[in-house]
């Protein structure tokens, strides 16, 4: 009898590593972070490493193996992936097949090499263009002769794409996303109040108080360091303040969407007006962001209910549905029998 080989769908985000395990029909989602200790190597990974972020002593580096949609450290990413799978998957990893979401402008070879050289001995590594996977995850049949526009606002990048016939007609990646919105909140608070907060606190503020248009009246207590007296302190921040702080960053993303719309062939433009613009990625959760995009583009916007996982859900469809299997490809050097 043959051993049942595992199948994995992998979305290597800068903020979360998302894996779909086909055999168990289960998702593994962890912060894409590793903690590496001097002379000792990998100390912790995933959510456990994230808990140490901004709290570790100088001999422990807590970093993400991904940076701005590219791989910052292949060895850290390999160690994380291997450890995560070994910890969660029963049985052999050898002979597994991997379906990996490939971001715009990322070289095809990178992920193939990452997995093949990781001593996990895969049977095959297949790539799916990330916007195509996101479209499938949103429930769109991306193989039709229909123009579909996706705006995927990730942690460090925003990917804006127009799809048709299973491929990317036009796509652009900008280095603005959730992280740059957090940074804008952090620096506005530092400038206005001489008050220093960590990036995790900035992220919490974004989740609670960020509005893209007409903020509702809300506020929260935050903890940080009063830079005048140099001591930790609590202070209150309001939704109005956050609205002003993030306006410019959101504007950059809106302008990039307009640029892509202007470059879209007219026949596909007609489809986009009819079908709407799909908004996904973790920062799609910013309150009323769909309203801002509707105002700026004049086109209705559909927001994914679970925007963080649209890509990995799309990979699950490629793996599970024969109709979409053809959307996966191998890098030119690689041929699997």
Feature names for model-found ranges:
Residues 1-150, 163-277, 284-311, 316-337:
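Nucleotide/phosphate-binding catalytic cleft detector across ATP-hydrolyzing
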Residues 159-161:
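A structural feature that tracks compact, well-ordered secondary-structure segments
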